[in-house]
Amino acid sequence: KVLFDFHSAAIDTDIIQDEDGMYHVFFKTEGGRKKGYRQYITKDLHNFASWGLLPYNCEDTHKAVEGAGVFQLIDGDWVMMYDCYIDGHYQFCTSKDLITFKRKQDTATKGMFTPRHGTVITITKKELKRLEKAFPNTK
């Protein structure tokens, strides 16, 4: 079943639920002249009539982007990361409200750091210790 129909090409959707139970549906527009990340906000993912579309793009750049991932930091701030694939870097933007994102850092995608459409998960200290034991740092 189709989750939503933007009435033109849309790819790379990421759905986040905030502390108030609101869903933030980030997606990249591929149709039309102005491509970029847009956002719907809703309380009910299964009632498209209740979705509200923000009137602007979310990314803090005019460069071509794709593969966004949104995650929350331990301090409560949010990060949107995406691939500036033509320019050869990943861009990280931060937000306190999941509405306004400001560029924090560009990281060159070269050498060992060449992510494409990645994601971030939170792990506990116990999980970190298990991972470090299973995959020791040999350098």
Model-assigned labels for residue ranges:
Residues K1-K139:
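Carbohydrate-active catalytic/glycan-binding domains of CAZyme proteins
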